[in-house]
Amino acid sequence: MAPYPYKVQTTVPELQYENFDGAKFGYMFWPVQNGTNEVRGRVLLIHGFGEYTKIQFRLMDHLSLNGYESFTFDQRGAGVTSPGRSKGVTDEYHVFNDLEHFVEKNLSECKAKGIPLFMWGHSMGGGICLNYACQGKHKNEISGYIGSGPLIILHPHTMYNKPTQIIAPLLAKFLPRVRIDTGLDLKGITSDKAYRAFLGSDPMSVPLYGSFRQIHDFMQRGAKLYKNENNYIQKNFAKDKPVIIMHGQDDTINDPKGSEKFIQDCPSADKELKLYPGARHSIFSLETDKVFNTVFNDMKQWLDKHTTTEAKP
């Protein structure tokens, strides 16, 4: 297996476990470790399809160095939460029920510390994040939303053919737990050869299994945002909450046009879309250091701008 290319500068926290609703979730809380240990806020990270905690180490490390705590968990169907044949097995109900559990856990801790909680989601997690901003139980208690290459619509390069689109709902209904290897598009994910080598040899990442139900549900979740039927976004988006979407302009997995349309439809007075020329799909976790440094700096500036409370010791 090729090594993880990034050298973590802080101390990697231990993976922790928590039982909830029939699953044993692996999660990680990364505290601020920057000399002063003053905390400006916390970011709850929602990973993409088939990802897990280690994929977020570079982002979490940088957040820590810049005064932000972070929290992420391996979703049902991914990582240590769902090993072996349970990988890829989940559905819409569990996605949001599980998320509400961890949102409540983090909100409780952040309120006790007097710090804001932001939500960040990448790809499939970006679609979850933006839908949470519209339908989440605690959507108005989150201080802001950040989407990274969110799954709203697939890029034509990745979109499956019409016959498959037609049969997908039937497969999800009658064979929900049947899994397929969807294939990992390494060139679409990143232009960095070292990260490609790591990901392509990582047993936690390949094969990239998804169940018919999981795949159907995350596609419908994105379509809900893109179609925006009955002004779903305008009527439901968290009141007065800021949102930023950051998307690689050369992303051939999730189409940047989906992000553009969401920002157009979103009623927030504080909304922003940043497109990055030359950047592919995984701009925070797996792209080149040059791309990462640019997007992280933009994210940090956005967080700093929206952090009204003074840093807490």
UniProtKB/Swiss-Prot annotation:
The keyword Oxidoreductase does not apply. The active site is at S123, D251, H281. Keywords: Cytoplasm, Endoplasmic reticulum, Hydrolase, Lipid droplet, Membrane, Mitochondrion, Mitochondrion outer membrane. Gene3D superfamilies: alpha/beta hydrolase. GO terms for cellular component: cell periphery; cytoplasm; endoplasmic reticulum; lipid droplet; membrane; mitochondrial outer membrane; mitochondrion; plasma membrane. GO terms for biological process: triglyceride catabolic process; triglyceride metabolic process. Active from pH 4.5 to 8. Converts monoacylglycerides (MAG) to free fatty acids and glycerol. Has a strong preference for monounsaturated monoglycerides. Required for efficient degradation of MAG, short-lived intermediates of glycerolipid metabolism which may also function as lipid signaling molecules. Controls inactivation of the signaling lipid N-palmitoylethanolamine (PEA). Involved in fatty acid ethyl ester (FAEE) catabolism. FAEEs are non-oxidative metabolites of ethanol that are transiently incorporated into lipid droplets (LDs). Belongs to the AB hydrolase superfamily. Monoacylglycerol lipase family. This is Monoglyceride lipase. It comes from Saccharomyces cerevisiae (strain ATCC 204508 / S288c) (Baker's yeast).
